[in-house]
Amino acid sequence: MRVFPTYIAVSGLFGGAFAAFGATNIKGQTKLFGTSFGILAKNASYDYVIVGGGTAGLTVAARLAAQPNVSVAVIEAGSFYEIDNGNISQVPGYGANYLSFNDLTPSPVLVDWGLITEPQDGLNNRQIHYSAGKTLGGSSALNDMIFHRATKGSYQRWAELVDDDTYTWDKLLPYLKKSVDFTKPKDAATYPYDASVYSPEGGPLQVSFPNYRAPCDDFMETAFTKSGLKPIKGLNSGHLDGFAPTTFVINPADQTRSSSEAAFLQEALDTTAMTLYLRTLAKKILFDTNKTANGVLVETNGAEYTISAKKEVILSAGVFHSPQLLLLSGIGQADSLEKFGIPVISDLAGVGQNLWDHLFIFTSHEMNITTNSGVLVDPELLAEAVESYLNQQTGPLTGIGGGVVGWEKLPNRVSFSNSTNETLASFPDDFPEVEYVALAPGSNPASDPLANHFASVTAAVQSTSSRGYVKLRSADPHDAPIININALSHPADADLAVGAIKRLRQIAEATGVRVKEVLPGPEVVSDAEILEWVRNNAVNGYHASSTCAMGNSSNPDAVVDTRAKVYGVSNLRVVDASALPYLPPGHPMSSIYAFAELIAEDILSK
């Protein structure tokens, strides 16, 4: 059983299940001491300098550091989430704490960048808090832990967009497998899976099914079947055309989150000489006169210094901060750089552009069964859940409140315009338009906050056509970038959102356990009323991508090539979701891990 450090940084109800975990590594040393940390405010040099200790960054760092005589430094603006927010990231059931949606105050503040979008025209001028991990593990420490792969056709599209068949399903599958240590379920009838898409060797990332089947899962399987969706053999075989229980990045030994920090970093700290620079802001990538990246200007607690790279700088700061740092370093559209007095190193128009995201919408319902919707707010229910979690590693805290996920192209398209149909036809044939899942925590109405019988039947619109951007707010790296998701700016997305709400209502009715709809409510009927409700309540999908998009050299909007190398300079790569040429369907985590594995292998092959 993997052990976790003992840290005291807990707040409110979410501290209930905090346990005393051991704190020593395989050498008997305390992990927070030793030689794994850089000397702050002192210049130093390494073979590889990685900016951002998130999902991709720690994967690449661990793979590089595992090689003999290779020195690796990771620059991270945050620290260990076990220190900064206790066990809120570790315990799966506490993940709802990150879903602040319309609350513009980030929570917990120490592991979230607190990014706020520009007012969204398509969302009736609302601003959205965009959760993004400011911690080791990045957004893999904050997300809902759903782990599945995209469709074969979507990977084929990736390959076509960048003119490189490395990104087809067959060629990418070894990298999709490489990170994953899959644990088979005890009940294969309840949790179907395809063993051929996992590697028996496995990697450090723990992928499994939860120890606990949420009440929502039973009625959603019934509803999906009655609504015409077909059961499929898991969600990791390149098919998303039906429904199945999803796998999660949860360690089956103790039912804790398996983030890139818990998986890749903890193992690397035990076995490699990786060096961490924590609570350290990367301010600028440094270049020599030949436009070769040779270091990063950083700041820790007001002290500015340089971390030099003898071989490469690898930018893994995420979909918002990677383009921001490129722009601050002189890589981007020349006009926008000159506006801030930033010397142009490489004139790349695509930096910060082409932002993709999904759209999250929901319906809320009162049910005639217990759903565990009150488990995080009712002290008695929480105490019971904590006891089950700590003593048996089961119960509602082992999951996110729902785990059966459905996918489809909307069957009722009579209200779609010809233009919408043409737009949707441009996506790959196996690209689902909508994802469905029922979630219980957080679904109680304000009038009945402690109830335990509500559920949200939710949808994430997948085939979105609205595109946003990331821009500099100023030349000061301390200032957050300007983020505009441009949600619902494309008419096809509006048609899909209205259709998805109608379909959610059908699915909720088909559960057989619904008492009444709470939201949007029976007074919201016409397409115009539904769309207005969506504009007032929908949020982004927290799957932003493609702001440093990959492409071949003939693409004027490409920022990196197919090996993540930034055009116009040398020894600089971008390895995170920002480098994807477009957003594959579903939750992109598995694709990001695979991309990081592929690029790490490419770096080591040189």
UniProtKB/Swiss-Prot annotation:
It catalyses: terremutin + A = terreate + AH2. Terreic acid is a metabolite with antibiotic properties. Terreic acid also acts as a selective inhibitor of human Bruton's tyrosine kinase in mast cells and other immune cells. One of its GO terms (molecular function) is lyase activity. Keywords: Glycoprotein, Oxidoreductase, Signal. Its EC number is 1.1.99.-. The keyword Glycoprotein applies. Pathway: Secondary metabolite biosynthesis. Residues 1-19 form the signal peptide. SUPFAM superfamilies: FAD-linked reductases, C-terminal domain (SSF54373), FAD/NAD(P)-binding domain (SSF51905). Glycans are attached at N43, N69, N87, N290, N368, N418, N421, N552. It holds the Pfam family GMC_oxred_N. The keyword Oxidoreductase applies. GO terms for biological process: secondary metabolite biosynthetic process. Disruption phenotype: Abolishes the production of terreic acid, but accumulates terremutin. InterPro entries: FAD/NAD-bd_sf, GMC_OxRdtase, GMC_OxRdtase_N, GMC_OxRtase_C. Belongs to the GMC oxidoreductase family. Glucose methanol choline oxidoreductase; part of the gene cluster that mediates the biosynthesis of terreic acid, a quinone epoxide inhibitor of Bruton's tyrosine kinase. The first step of the pathway is the synthesis of 6-methylsalicylic acid (6-MSA) by the 6-methylsalicylic acid synthase atX. In the biosynthesis of 6-MSA, atX utilizes one acetyl-CoA and three malonyl-CoAs as its substrates and catalyzes a series of programmed reactions including Claisen condensation, reduction, aldol cyclization, and the hydrolytic cleavage that yields 6-MSA. This is Glucose methanol choline oxidoreductase atC. It comes from Aspergillus terreus (strain NIH 2624 / FGSC A1156).
